[in-house]
């Protein structure tokens, strides 16, 4: 029997403005780690302020990956994230270091942990198909998805527990998008990661206050000029132009709203995004929640949890 090597991977997740960067730097130093960005916008060159990108002088000598790897006219798909991150995990682990993935793009993180497979013609997952099964299972129970898999790929159904809805839906989606049996493809990725996910959180009023303050700091640091540059390159027509903190400026640049209205919209969109992030991590992923902003004394408990996981 072939023994599959399990790679330890630490994920630090959570909404924007909750303190992920500071914790990741501290833990990377403590655990001899390297950091992989799990943020879908930090891949873009020249977009530093609006993405809250950690700059080289702030990285404290810790290697950071998946930052500044794309031009603003290039797409960064979940398939590419999974592929690149998997390769980085293997490389970092082989060098005796701990991969630490930091970010708030929940779908990307979930896809990595669940081991979603993306064929060459399937550059993006079928989100509508996947969500339809999650919605149906929420009403009828997870067995309904498993029974469908049993009809389409009995061997896969035998190998997957009915209660493991994420994996069942992954198998159904694979059959749906490729026309091939899930049981016949090498689906080992999800079994090669020994992942531990810390999700930072905070009481909503405090989180929203921090988000508003962060936006003000970004504006003071030159966010408007950064957004103007992006607008002049093509703005909303570019993949990078859809990011929060950027697209809200475009109506102002077109003379359709005021500067203050643009800033208020960035704050509103950022708060709504934080709410969606928390909902995603709560409903779609298995995480350990911790509120360090209001309870810094819990920092010691993180060390205890990690020591147990790493032992």
Curated annotation (Swiss-Prot):
GO BP annotations, alphabetical order: tRNA modification
Domain of life: Bacteria
Residues marked Interaction with substrate tRNA (site): 105, 130
Catalyzed reaction equations: adenosine(37) in tRNA + dimethylallyl diphosphate = N(6)-dimethylallyladenosine(37) in tRNA + diphosphate
Record-level Gene Ontology MF annotations: ATP binding; tRNA dimethylallyltransferase activity
Keywords: ATP-binding, Magnesium, Nucleotide-binding, Transferase, tRNA processing
Residues engaged in binding ATP: 14-21
Keyword presence, Transferase: yes
Sequence segments annotated as region (Interaction with substrate tRNA): 39-42
Gene3D superfamilies per the UniProt record, alphabetical: 1.10.20.140, P-loop containing nucleotide triphosphate hydrolases
Residues binding substrate: 16-21
EC number: 2.5.1.75
Cofactor(s) required for function per UniProt: Mg(2+)
Family to which the UniProt record says this protein belongs: Belongs to the IPP transferase family.
Subunit: Monomer.
Function: Catalyzes the transfer of a dimethylallyl group onto the adenine at position 37 in tRNAs that read codons beginning with uridine, leading to the formation of N6-(dimethylallyl)adenosine (i(6)A).
Name by which UniProt lists this protein: tRNA dimethylallyltransferase
């Amino acid at each position: 029997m072939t023994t599959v090597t399990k790679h330890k991977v630490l994920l630090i997740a959570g909404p924007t403005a909750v303190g992920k960067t500071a914790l990741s730097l501290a833990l990377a130093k403590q655990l001899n780690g390297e950091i992989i960005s799990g943020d879908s916008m930090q891949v873009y060159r020249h977009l530093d302020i609006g993405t809250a990108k950690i700059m080289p002088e702030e990285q404290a000598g810790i290697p950071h990956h998946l930052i500044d790897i794309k031009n603003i006219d290039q797409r960064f798909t979940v398939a590419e994230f999974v592929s690149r991150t998997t390769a980085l995990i293997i490389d970092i682990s082989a060098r005796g270091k701990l991969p630490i993935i930091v970010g708030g793009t929940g779908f990307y993180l979930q896809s990595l942990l669940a081991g979603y497979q993306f064929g060459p013609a399937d550059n993006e997952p079928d989100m509508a198909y996947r969500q339809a099964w999650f919605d149906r299972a929420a009403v009828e129970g997870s067995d309904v998805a498993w029974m469908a898999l049993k009809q389409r790929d009995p061997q896969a159904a035998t190998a997957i527990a009915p209660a493991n809805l994420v994996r069942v839906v992954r198998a159904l989606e694979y059959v749906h998008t490729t026309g091939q049996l899930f049981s016949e493809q090498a689906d080992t990725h999800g079994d090669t990661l020994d992942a531990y996910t810390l999700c930072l959180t905070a009481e909503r009023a405090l989180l929203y206050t921090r988000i508003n303050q962060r936006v003000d700091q970004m504006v003071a640091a030159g966010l408007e000029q950064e957004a103007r540059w992006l607008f002049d390159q093509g703005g909303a027509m570019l993949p990078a132009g859809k990011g929060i903190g950027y697209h809200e400026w475009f109506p102002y640049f077109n003379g359709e709203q005021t500067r203050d209205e643009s800033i208020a919209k960035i704050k509103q969109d950022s708060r709504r995004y934080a709410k969606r992030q928390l909902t995603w991590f709560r409903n779609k992923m298995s995480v350990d929640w911790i509120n360090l902003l209001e309870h810094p004394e819990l920092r010691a408990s993180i060390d205890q949890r990690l020591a147990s996981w790493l032992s």
